[in-house]
């Protein structure tokens, strides 16, 4: 009789262990899914943002050529310095983003480390947006120089490229922030 009791108890324990393992596997799968969804949105948003940033730089270079031809590039030194500082900040942010992405992808089986990678990606993105804000300020400064030199119309084409780039960056930022919201909602 006692032997049968122990067999039943052992059976219940084994079944309980399987249920617990199944539930924990389900929880891990759900955690992995939201992390993958967030990563995908953040990665796609980053790519779009980066494409927009390249357009802004291209438009700035177009305006630089106009300024050289019109003879007032030396008056754009302050704006160019702010733009360069912004590019440097954005580059540091991109480096942190890349480190975070590598940390995430290298540690998919370790959720706590993978989450740290997502956090690094978020920090890198925000650093990059700070740099982009600085670049926008420098572009505005250079546009004021062009206006004072009577060359606003000559900056039109470069500024169109810059505006398209800024719109692309804004759309990329929206997508990135949707992924970030998923991370913040599920953080442990």
Walk through the language-model features, giving the residues of each.
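Asp/Glu-rich intrinsically disordered low-complexity tracts
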Residues: 37, 44, 51, 64, ...
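Immediate post-signal-peptide N-terminus of mature secreted/exported proteins
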Residues: 25-87, 91, 182-188
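Hydrophobic alpha-helical segments of integral membrane proteins
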Residues: 20-21, 26, 97
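C-terminal amphipathic alpha-helix
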Residues: 35-38, 49, 58, 130-188
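Bacterial N-terminal signal peptides
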Residues: 12-22
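Mid-chain, structured segments of secreted extracytoplasmic proteins
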Residues: 70-116, 120
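Bacterial N-terminal signal peptides that target proteins for export
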Residues: 2-13
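Charged heptad-repeat coiled-coil "stalk" segments of single-pass membrane proteins
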Residues: 98-131, 138-142, 148-150, 156
């Amino acid at each position: 009789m006692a032997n049968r009791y122990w067999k039943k108890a052992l059976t219940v324990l084994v079944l309980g262990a399987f249920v617990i393992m199944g539930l924990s596997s389900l929880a891990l799968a759900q955690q992995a899914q939201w992390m993958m969804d967030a990563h995908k949105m953040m990665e796609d948003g980053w790519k779009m943002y980066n494409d927009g940033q390249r357009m802004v730089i291209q438009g700035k270079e177009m305006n630089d050529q106009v300024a050289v031809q019109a003879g007032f590039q030396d008056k754009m030194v302050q704006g160019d310095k702010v733009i360069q500082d912004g590019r440097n900040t954005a580059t540091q942010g991109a480096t942190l983003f890349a480190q975070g992405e590598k940390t995430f992808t290298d540690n998919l089986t370790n959720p706590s480390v993978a989450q740290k990678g997502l956090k690094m990606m978020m920090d890198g993105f925000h650093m990059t947006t700070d740099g982009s804000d600085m670049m926008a300020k420098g572009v505005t400064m250079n546009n004021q120089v062009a206006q004072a030199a009577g060359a606003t119309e000559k900056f039109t084409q470069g500024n169109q490229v810059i505006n398209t780039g800024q719109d692309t960056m804004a759309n990329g930022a929206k997508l990135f922030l949707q992924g970030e919201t998923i991370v913040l909602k599920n953080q442990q």
